[in-house]
From Swiss-Prot:
The modification N6-acetyllysine is found at residues 54, 250, 285, 354, 375. Catalyzes the reversible interconversion of serine and glycine with tetrahydrofolate (THF) serving as the one-carbon carrier. This reaction serves as the major source of one-carbon groups required for the biosynthesis of purines, thymidylate, methionine, and other important biomolecules. Also exhibits THF-independent aldolase activity toward beta-hydroxyamino acids, producing glycine and aldehydes, via a retro-aldol mechanism. Its EC number is 2.1.2.1. Homodimer. The gene is glyA. It is found in: Cytoplasm. The lineage of its organism: Bacteria, Pseudomonadati, Pseudomonadota, Gammaproteobacteria, Enterobacterales. Gene3D superfamilies: Aspartate Aminotransferase, domain 1 (3.90.1150.10), Type I PLP-dependent aspartate aminotransferase-like (Major domain) (3.40.640.10). This is Serine hydroxymethyltransferase. It catalyses: (6R)-5,10-methylene-5,6,7,8-tetrahydrofolate + glycine + H2O = (6S)-5,6,7,8-tetrahydrofolate + L-serine.
Length: 417
């Protein structure tokens, strides 16, 4: 018999200490990594539930194991909410991650060796959009497209590449692009050569759900997303589609299970269901609107302080600061800001002279600070502190002074009150 009072603290002090230290780190550091966010206690309650015990290979009503009558309800709730939230008529909530959702789409729509047009990783794309170190770059013939001199997607070049290489699939979506993507234009290009349009909206799904960023679901053949990032749910993936055939939906389901995964994580799917319900609340829209406002406010300060922002601004939750002219590397900036309890990630910028392990830029995102309650005033103040650190990157006294300010604002705006 298992006693409910069993706990980690009394049993595994070494593990518990690391967990507690991470809790303190999250409370005492300002999180600006664009792909990170804070999930609600309700989501964590679902993830720590007895649903973690249940194997449920298959789909609701079509399981390979008995005893699935209640987890069927859980998964169907998640499916129905995903469809309602994004205006889809198909949803698969089983992918363990965004990358596995993307793997399923490749598996369902393509054969190894097929040509795919994807955004260049160095211009803001993602590993799964064709990087040579990823399955996508190893199994498929990848043709990259990118951004123009203004820092925006070069649709003329994209169309030219599409007509020249005749890819079977075009990928829209990004991990470090601050503009608005013209999904309709991408579909028009895809249709002109008979290609699939697959959109990975992982970074902007929360903004899309709130109507703050254009919804790709009506335009793409298939859409994937993560359920964390701006959506603020548990770490996981999701596949969506609208207006497709039953044959396509069967292929997608089969590509997830049994094609790429075994049993789904029912405790995580419950967390997804909760997060999707939270995303339907009016306050979620207010939150996403503030995420975008905070990003614009921070960009304003960086520009005023003489820093270059890729594409000159932002229309979503993130932006890239190009440090080439400052003779700084992303690695140096990341480390110095980290010592001030400000967490960012080093990031390549277009035409970056440095390697991906060093880089010449940093990526900044506002979902997590907005979750804490930051508004434009706090966002601008924070951007100013970051510039102070970057202006005096080797001055530990400046870094310590900013760290004190960070600890103070973190105490005033706790993650979990």
């Amino acid at each position: 018999m298992l006693k409910r009072e069993m706990n980690i603290a009394d049993y595994d002090a070494e593990l518990w200490q690391a967990m507690e230290q991470e809790k303190v780190r999250q409370e005492e550091h300002i999180e600006l990594i664009a792909s990170e966010n804070y999930t609600s206690p309700r989501v964590m309650q679902a993830q720590g539930s007895q649903l973690t015990n249940k194997y449920a290979e298959g789909y609701p009503g079509k399981r390979y194991y008995g005893g699935c009558e209640y987890v069927d309800i859980v998964e169907q709730l998640a499916i129905d909410r995903a469809k309602e939230l994004f205006g889809a008529d198909y949803a698969n909530v089983q992918p363990h991650s965004g990358s596995q959702a993307n793997f399923a789409v490749y598996t369902a729509l393509l054969e190894p060796g097929d040509t795919v047009l994807g955004m260049n990783l160095a211009h803001g794309g993602h590993l799964t959009h064709g990087s040579p170190v990823n399955f996508s770059g190893k199994l498929y013939n990848i043709v990259p497209y990118g951004i123009d001199a203004t820092g925006h997607i070069d649709y003329a070049d994209l169309e030219k590449q599409a007509k020249e290489h005749k890819p079977k699939m075009i990928i829209g979506g990004f991990s470090a692009y601050s503009g608005v993507v013209d999904w309709a234009k991408m579909r028009e290009i895809a249709d002109s050569i008979g290609a699939y349009l697959f959109v990975d909206m992982a970074h902007v799904a929360g903004l899309v759900a709130a109507g703050v960023y254009p919804n790709p679901v009506p335009h793409a053949h298939v859409v994937t997303t993560t359920t964390h990032k701006t959506l603020a749910g548990p770490r996981g993936g999701l596949i969506l589609a609208k207006g497709g055939s039953e044959e396509l939906y069967k292929k997608l389901n089969s590509a997830v299970f049994p094609g790429g995964q075994g049993g789904p994580l029912m405790h995580v799917i419950a967390g997804k269901a909760v997060a999707l319900k939270e995303a339907m609340e009016p306050e979620f829209k207010t939150y996403q609107q503030q995420v975008a406002k905070n990003a614009k406010a921070m960009v304003e300060v960086f520009l005023e302080r003489g820093y270059k922002v890729v594409s000159g601004g932002t229309d979503n939750h993130l932006f890239l600061v190009d440090l080439v002219d400052k003779n700084l590397t992303g690695k140096e900036a990341d480390a110095a800001l980290g010592r001030a309890n400000i967490t960012v990630n080093k990031n390549s910028v277009p035409n970056d002279p440095k390697s991906p392990f060093v880089t010449s830029g940093i990526r900044v995102g506002t979902p997590a600070i907005t979750r804490r309650g930051f508004k434009e005033v706090e966002a601008k103040e924070l951007a100013g502190w970051m510039c102070d650190v970057l202006d005096s990157i080797n001055d530990e006294a400046v870094i310590e002074r900013i760290k004190g300010k960070v600890l103070d604002i973190c105490a005033r705006y706790p993650v979990y009150a």
